[in-house]
Amino acid sequence: MAKKSATKKKPTVKRRKSKKSVRIALIGAGGRSVSTHYPALSDLAEANVVAACDLDENRLQTACNRFGIPGRYSDYRQMIEREKPDAVYAIMPPHHLYDVSADIIERGCHLFVEKPPAVTTEQTRQLALLAEKHGVLTGVTFQRRFSPLIRRGKQQCEERGTVHTAHASFYKNWVGADAYYKGGMDMLTADGIHAVDTLRYLCGGEVESVAADSRRLDAGHCNIHLAL
């Protein structure tokens, strides 16, 4: 008689500790948060994740149990009032993000969000002005500029002098996938913006003019895979 195989549980992540730490609270316990942000914060000795918030109770408990997060909430306002974090990660759909981000900033917490930081350019400007008014730091997940390869490229650009013209291409497999947040984001703001940010970082200065185009290379299967 065959033995039943035991269900494997995901191991609890051991957190690094530091004498000097930043109190962090997270809004969102979905796929992007758990696959990227929670693990990254667990690797930072200075990051003390004190609480997390999500409307999905099961998802919240699963994430908090895995990463050893003590505070668990369904209301982010209550979480901020009780936990008093130094910074808040708001990892959520862009069409819900503006009001939450503005509220977090007005409460005096530093803010970190996924891209795009808002649905419109004007909303983004307003958040920037609000952050300046309240003296808080804000950040958006443009992590490619921290890649050793990109940093080396930045060094070479600075050594060679002023960049007058630059070009970037971005390819994305999208076979059988639904639109981002049912159309709440497009390909540029969701993914292609990484190429824009990397180009700006490499070149430095401010952009004076832009020319861009996009097209679909239709195929019934994934025919390209690129990563950086």
Predicted segments, located by residue:
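Core-facing hydrophobic residues within beta-strands of well-ordered domains
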Residues: 47-49, 163, 207
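Beta-loop-alpha module in the N-terminal Rossmann-like domain of NAD(P)-dependent dehydrogenases
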Residues: 67-128
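Short active-site oxyanion
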Residues: 47-51, 86-88, 138, 185-187
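A contiguous active-site-proximal alpha/beta segment in oxidoreductase catalytic domains
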Residues: 118-176
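Short catalytic-loop micro-motif centered on adjacent basic/acidic residues
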Residues: 90, 111-114, 138-142, 211
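Rossmann-like dinucleotide-binding domain that binds NAD(P)(H)
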Residues: 176-228
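N-terminal Rossmann-like dinucleotide-binding module
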Residues: 3-4, 8-67
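Alpha-helical elements of Rossmann-like donor-binding domains used by nucleotide-donor carbohydrate transfer enzymes
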Residues: 62, 78, 87, 99, ...
